[in-house]
Amino acid sequence: DVTEGTAIGEPTECALVNYAEKLGLSKNIKKYEYVRIGEVPFDSMRKMMTTVHKTASGEIVQFTKGAPDEILKRCSKAMINGEVVDMNEDIRKTILGENKNMADKALRVLAAAMRPLKEEPVAYDSEAVEKDLCFVGLVGMIDPVRPEVKPAIDQCRTAGIRPIMITG
């Protein structure tokens, strides 16, 4: 949710909302233009989540975000320079290469995809909804150091342990 210019909620969602705001997209406006009518919640096994929306003009569209490799497995199309094209191995390799470049810069990368629907899904399960997607882009986020990390490192050093790398 966005209140007085501040995103409130899960850190990943806040980062995406803040980025969209920087691109000139207002969540408060979009929430009325794209009313959420259903979702397939995030699942760590699928590494993605999907929301389904009804537009002001009555169209139904789904948006899916998640791990790039998992999203790409479900994409049959890609949006390139505003044009929807069939997904092929060259496009897939280019996307995965850019994903690697971003990950090599210590960014946490999410892929975004969409699909226009003829009607609201009968069931909101991943097999029925998360298929035939159109890849629309990647976004990389910096994962800030958690507040408990510095004290944990100090505690390790005090105990004679030399931390080398902390992940996850």
Where are these regions (language model features)?
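Cytosolic catalytic regions of ATP/NTP-dependent phosphoryl-transfer enzymes
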Residues: 1-135, 141, 151-155, 159-168
